[in-house]
Amino acid sequence: MIFVLDVGNTNAVLGVFEEGKLCQHWRMETDRHKTEDEYGMLIKQLLEHEGLSFGDIKGIIVSSVVPPIMFALERMCEKYFKIKPLVVGPGIKTGLNIKYENPREVGADRIVNAVAGIQLYGSPLIIVDFGTATTYCYINEEKHYMGGVITPGIMISAEALYSRAAKLPRIEITKPSSIVGKNTVSAMQAGILYGYVGQVEGIVKRMKEEAKQEPTVIATGGLAKLIAEESNVIDIVDPFLTLKGLYMLYERNAILQHEKGE
């Protein structure tokens, strides 16, 4: 079994793959203050709840956009799993041709999504990942990573409205019964949801026009399904695209290491 860990700014998503299939997955809050022991005990409980143990895991890969947390996670893997994790970053073999001005600036999550998107859905592609920040990545027909767009995530937008407007409440992000709100909460829900849908459709439209292509549009991330249901530009929702990409990267690098005799 292979353990994959995708650490975002708000949440971390964990998964276990067996023979290429995602058999378990969990989501937990990203906590920069937890120690390797706290993470170890938390993951131990998650595994045991599914009848698994540290000893069942034969390999680990980690992707993180939160550098301060990596030391604790790497120590945790070595202490409890007795495995040195593969970390998405410099030195890992992705197979991607990245056309960014500085390829090192491309976030680990965006690289992982691109790897999975190309392998699962071909190219050209636009991948929209609804996280703390929403990222749009464009992969052309030659499977080159061309760049993309980064915007504040929908939760950041909602929190900004709540925190900067004294009389507006904190709300749940959900579909309202009507675009025309009949109270403050439903009016805010309509504004945040449909405003964000409009942003997605506008950015995707402009990316397609500039690329002069009709790429497949893949959505992933926590709110992908909600946005996709209200949008006419998203072709496929794959909530586990990042976890699948992590597994693919693990397999690719494990094969290369085996061929080198490492």
Curated annotation (Swiss-Prot):
Pathway(s) this gene product operates in, as recorded in its UniProt entry: Cofactor biosynthesis; coenzyme A biosynthesis; CoA from (R)-pantothenate: step 1/5
Keyword match ATP-binding: yes
Residues of the active site: 109
Matches recorded under Pfam families: Pan_kinase
Subcellular location: Cytoplasm
Details of cofactor binding: A monovalent cation. Ammonium or potassium.
Keywords: ATP-binding, Coenzyme A biosynthesis, Cytoplasm, Kinase, Metal-binding, Nucleotide-binding, Potassium, Transferase
Catalyzed reaction equations: (R)-pantothenate + ATP = (R)-4'-phosphopantothenate + ADP + H(+)
Residues at which K(+) binds: 129
UniProt cofactor(s): NH4(+); K(+)
Binding site for substrate: 100, 107-110, 184
Top-rank lineage group of the source organism: Bacteria
Sequence similarity: Belongs to the type III pantothenate kinase family.
HAMAP family tied to this protein: Pantothen_kinase_3
Function: Catalyzes the phosphorylation of pantothenate (Pan), the first step in CoA biosynthesis.
Protein name in the entry: Type III pantothenate kinase
Gene source species: Bacillus cytotoxicus (strain DSM 22905 / CIP 110041 / 391-98 / NVH 391-98)
Lineage: Bacteria, Bacillati, Bacillota, Bacilli, Bacillales
